[in-house]
């Protein structure tokens, strides 16, 4: 029996995608091979690779000025790869820290330059807000400005993206990419791990403006140098072929759903249902300011935290899995990515109401 999976990542996958992958596991399109057996330079995989790139460019509206790269190492590796590729002759990059992941990015950048904290969303209750542009104190000549547009752990999402002129904006979009339309032209670099809305763990997405490809530090490994990866169409070394294949199936699924406008409408409906349930209750609490609440990751706390384990056990009995909050913040977290259906959120809300009534 399939359950409703609220994991933050690796996360729920569209069932259609899983079934198609299962059907094609032993014999992809009459080739007699599984995708995971194919040469990454053979015509079979090349057709998969090119289709994935084309479909993603179409879904996001990626302009011709930007290259799409498939790498490895996840978002955490990009915390090192970004400064190694963008600092160039400069030493400073600015960071807007809105949660745990942008804090990790800021800390990692200290190994390669002198990062500057331009703004923070931290309050006495933790990370609960997204600083607006007027609050950003940028340095005089930063190589780039870094922002995590959705903080998976803290449940903070930044919706208003400013125009920074000649300063490249770098965004970690790991946990909200493909959940809503984006103006890619506003960004110098977008990056994210795949294991939330793109597909399975193993491939990392980077979208980089071409004019930024000549800034790499000499210490940057060739396998992580964006210019080298772009020149080789993401095939400089053996790529994570099966993860790219799965990502391609997800892109096709998204197009069948009506694209990102249709997906965004669904996600707004799911998030509203869950937040309304939390806000109308004295038993559940979300600490994030309403304007910065994530549509993808909804942390919440029980008024009586001694009942956390009872809540999780009861949820599991109803087929509602992986609701435990991140160890750094505690409580609960429901990750309601694209593949989590409205029915799953309705089932969670019904359980939350039942659990509250039993404890009243």
From Swiss-Prot:
Keywords: Amino-acid biosynthesis, Aminotransferase, Cytoplasm, Pyridoxal phosphate, Pyridoxine biosynthesis, Serine biosynthesis, Transferase. Binds 1 pyridoxal phosphate per subunit. Its main location: cytoplasm. Its cofactor is pyridoxal 5'-phosphate. Pathway: Amino-acid biosynthesis; L-serine biosynthesis; L-serine from 3-phospho-D-glycerate: step 2/3; Cofactor biosynthesis; pyridoxine 5'-phosphate biosynthesis; pyridoxine 5'-phosphate from D-erythrose 4-phosphate: step 3/5. GO terms for molecular function: O-phospho-L-serine:2-oxoglutarate aminotransferase activity; pyridoxal phosphate binding. Pyridoxal 5'-phosphate binds at residues 101, 152, 172, 195, 237-238. L-glutamate binds at residue 41. It is found in: Cytoplasm. The keyword Transferase applies. InterPro entries: Aminotrans_V_dom, Aminotrans_V_PyrdxlP_BS, Pser_aminoTfrase, PyrdxlP-dep_Trfase, PyrdxlP-dep_Trfase_major, PyrdxlP-dep_Trfase_small. Its EC number is 2.6.1.52. NCBIfam families: PRK05355.1 (NF003764), serC_1 (TIGR01364). HAMAP family: SerC_aminotrans_5. Homodimer. Catalyzes the reversible conversion of 3-phosphohydroxypyruvate to phosphoserine and of 3-hydroxy-2-oxo-4-phosphonooxybutanoate to phosphohydroxythreonine. This is Phosphoserine aminotransferase. It comes from Burkholderia lata (strain ATCC 17760 / DSM 23089 / LMG 22485 / NCIMB 9086 / R18194 / 383). The lineage of its organism: Bacteria, Pseudomonadati, Pseudomonadota, Betaproteobacteria, Burkholderiales.
């Amino acid at each position: 029996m399939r359950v409703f999976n609220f994991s933050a990542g690796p996360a729920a996958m569209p069932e259609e995608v899983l079934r198609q992958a299962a059907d094609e596991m032993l014999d992809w399109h009459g080739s007699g091979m599984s995708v995971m057996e194919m040469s990454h330079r053979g015509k079979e995989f090349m057709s998969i690779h090119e289709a994935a790139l084309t479909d993603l460019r179409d879904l996001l509206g990626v302009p011709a000025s930007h290259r799409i790269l498939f790498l490895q190492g996840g978002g955490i590796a990009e915390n090192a790869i970004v400064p190694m590729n963008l600092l160039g002759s400069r030493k400073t990059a600015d960071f807007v820290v809105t949660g745990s992941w942008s804090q990790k990015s800021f800390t990692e950048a200290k190994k390669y330059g002198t990062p500057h904290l331009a703004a923070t969303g931290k309050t006495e209750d933790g990370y609960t807000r997204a600083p607006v542009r007027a609050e950003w104190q940028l340095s005089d000549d930063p190589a780039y400005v870094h922002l995590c547009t959705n903080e998976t752990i803290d449940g903070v999402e930044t919706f208003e993206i400013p125009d920074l002129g000649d300063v490249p904006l770098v965004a970690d979009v790991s946990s909200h990419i493909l959940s809503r339309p984006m103006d890619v032209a506003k960004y110098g670099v977008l990056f994210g791990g795949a294991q939330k809305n793109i597909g399975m763990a193993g491939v990392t997405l980077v979208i980089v403006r071409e004019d930024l490809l000549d800034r790499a530090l000499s210490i940057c490994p060739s396998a992580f140098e964006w210019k080298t990866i772009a020149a080789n169409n993401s095939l400089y070394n053996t790529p994570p072929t099966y993860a790219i294949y799965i990502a391609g199936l997800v892109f096709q699924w998204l197009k069948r759903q009506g694209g990102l406008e249709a997906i965004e409408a669904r996600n707004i409906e799911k998030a509203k249902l869950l937040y309304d349930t939390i806000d109308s209750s004295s038993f559940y609490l979300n600490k994030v300011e309403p304007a910065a609440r994530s549509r993808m990751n909804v942390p919440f706390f029980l008024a009586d935290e001694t009942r956390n384990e009872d809540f999780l056990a009861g949820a599991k009995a109803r087929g509602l899995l992986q609701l435990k909050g991140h160890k750094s913040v505690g409580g609960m977290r429901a990750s309601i990515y694209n593949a989590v259906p409205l029915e799953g959120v309705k089932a969670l809300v019904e359980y939350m109401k039942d659990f509250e009534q039993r404890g009243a």
